[in-house]
């Protein structure tokens, strides 16, 4: 697959910009290769001051009443001053490293609900600034992210929403100005202690920090109780881990903390069944099962102890 973004030719600068990604599919932390081609459409030479690339995405503001807005969350300079001769073309190749916290937009080969991210090219030509059309970037999960989401699917969680929330989390080593949040309806085994589960995944070169945000509606009037638990897992050895047992252990730990923080509530957090019998082993998880949700999209097949939790 090859994706291309082309800017409109600028009558002021006489320059058109084309950005091409030979393979738009990638993962957080990997390099994204491509080429920016500039064409001086008129007979005059064009002096280019710089070329920059930026990653952009739709982000939910901290004020829930405000609409989503397009945010450029990372930028790379790829070229300094040079001249494009009149009637000629100039190509600039690049291979830029994606941030480790780049939001995942594709899961199980399917777009993850409405989440999108794109690459935008900025060309500075005195005194104008040309921004080319955005080129979609298809960000697939890292193995640790893949295993986590597959385990949640195997345990019976159903995705209900996915988005990017502006702001920084306290006491978390966060590098981007937002977090990717994935919301799930609680699986039947865990539906007593909680109503909804929100998952935040923050990755770095060594591993992944996972935040489980539990929410339980305590009354028909809409009163809720929320709590957050944090866990850490390493990329090394991810394929050898029993992810269903790991995630089930995280959930039970989070539910215990959730119950302790809401000791006044008239409900019990005890879970007596095993996670491994919530779905019969003779019923494998088919690709696309479970992450259908109410907001669209489809998802993932099964996954398969430990991890530090707080």
Q: What are the residue ranges of the model-derived segments?
A:
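A eukaryote-biased signal for short, well-structured alpha-helical docking elements
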Residues: 1-12
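A short beta-turn/strand-edge loop motif at beta-sheet boundaries
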Residues: 40-49
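Internal, hydrophobic beta-strand segments that form the core of beta-sheet-rich folds
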Residues: 53-58, 95-101, 109-128
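Short aromatic-acidic-glycine turn motif
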Residues: 55-69, 217-223
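A beta-strand/beta-hairpin structural motif
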Residues: 66-109, 129-131
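Short beta-strand elements
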Residues: 126-153
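C-terminal interaction module
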Residues: 173-258
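Short hydrophobic helical membrane-anchoring segments positioned at the boundary
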Residues: 263-310
């Amino acid at each position: 697959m090859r994706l291309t973004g082309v800017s409109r030719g600028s009558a002021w600068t006489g320059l058109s910009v084309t950005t091409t990604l030979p393979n738009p599919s990638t993962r957080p932390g990997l390099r994204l290769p491509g080429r920016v081609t500039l064409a001086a459409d008129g007979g005059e030479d064009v002096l280019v001051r710089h070329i920059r690339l930026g990653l952009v995405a739709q982000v939910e503001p901290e004020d829930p009443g405000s609409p989503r807005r397009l945010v450029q969350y990372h930028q790379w300079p790829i070229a300094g001053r040079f001249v494009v001769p009149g009637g000629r073309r100039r190509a600039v190749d690049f291979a830029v490293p994606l941030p480790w916290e780049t939001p995942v937009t594709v899961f199980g080969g399917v777009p993850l609900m409405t989440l999108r991210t794109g690459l935008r090219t900025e060309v500075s030509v005195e005194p104008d600034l040309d921004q080319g059309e955005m080129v979609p970037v298809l960000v697939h999960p890292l193995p640790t992210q893949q295993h986590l989401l597959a385990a949640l699917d195997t345990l019976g969680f159903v995705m209900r929403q996915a988005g990017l929330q502006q702001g920084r989390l306290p006491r978390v080593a966060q590098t981007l100005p937002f977090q990717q949040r994935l919301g799930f309806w609680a699986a039947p085994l865990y539906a007593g202690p909680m109503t909804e589960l929100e998952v935040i995944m923050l990755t770095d070169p060594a591993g992944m920090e996972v935040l489980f945000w539990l929410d339980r509606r305590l009354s028909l009037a809409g009163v809720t109780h929320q709590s957050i638990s944090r866990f850490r897992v390493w990329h090394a050895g991810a394929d050898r881990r029993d992810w269903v047992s790991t995630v089930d252990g995280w959930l039970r730990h989070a539910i215990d903390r959730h119950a302790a923080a809401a000791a006044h509530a008239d409900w019990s957090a005890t879970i007596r069944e095993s996670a491994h019998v919530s779905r019969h082993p003779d019923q494998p998880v088919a690709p696309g099962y479970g992450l259908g949700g109410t907001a669209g999209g489809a998802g993932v097949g099964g996954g398969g102890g430990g991890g530090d939790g707080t």
